[in-house]
Amino acid sequence: MSFLVLLLVLLIEKFSGWRARVQRDGWWLGWLDAVGGVKSMTAQPWLGLLVAVLPPLLLLALLLTILEPVAYGLLALPLQLLVVVWSLGRGDVLRAIGPFRDAWRREDAQGAYHVAERDLGVQVQADRDNDLLAVVQGTLVWQAYQAFFAVIFWYALLGPVAALAYRLLAIAAEQDRQPVLRERAAQLRHAFDWLPARALVLSFALVGNFVAVTRMLLHDLLAWDVPAARLLARAGYVAEDFNEGGLGAKGVASLDALWQLLVRSAVLWYAVFAIWALLL
């Protein structure tokens, strides 16, 4: 059933606008505000984060426990699908990067800086245009990872509760209304990112330049303190072996190549999940 959910999620992601209608974060942000408004919780931020995160996770686990024994688990299928779709990232990075691609292709550096800040949240004080391109490349890899790969990884490994936990922590780590809870959520999210980020780096090596990735990043693979975003940005750059960039078509081609690397990695992951489902 897990692989069926993964296939349905992929179809919804690619061919439906249902995800945007499902993803409503108001209830979670409101609950964070309620927990953060209690002085005892802000004085003990780890306790506050646990009080915020555990109730929705326990409720989901209870519902799954009730529904899975009924009708061979078919009643749990819609719930799992709903949870995984909600847990996917917000927005569409490929669409968001479109104006940057257009400006870069026109060799409009000033316009590229503007749309990168406006649409991608990238703020770079760069002396060279290639520095901006490298940051946008890293943003593309990170957004694709946190929006899709990490959620799918945790769902396949530990089920919908883990996928939901990842997105709850991600939203808590990115909100600015409860800074104390945000700091603790970011630390816990770093732990959640450690394993799937390394798995994606290994898949980059398998579908890209294996020798370059292993030579350049072997030491960082086991380093706990290396941020996932930085590791993935370096891995994507090395796996595609970008030797040329700069304004114009070559820079845009590097973004296209990076996206194709992500697509090949997704195909590899789905193939692994399919084999896993057959063997279990």
Protein language model annotation of sequence segments:
Residues M1-L280:
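Hydrophobic N-terminal alpha-helices or hydrophobic patches in metabolic proteins across all domains
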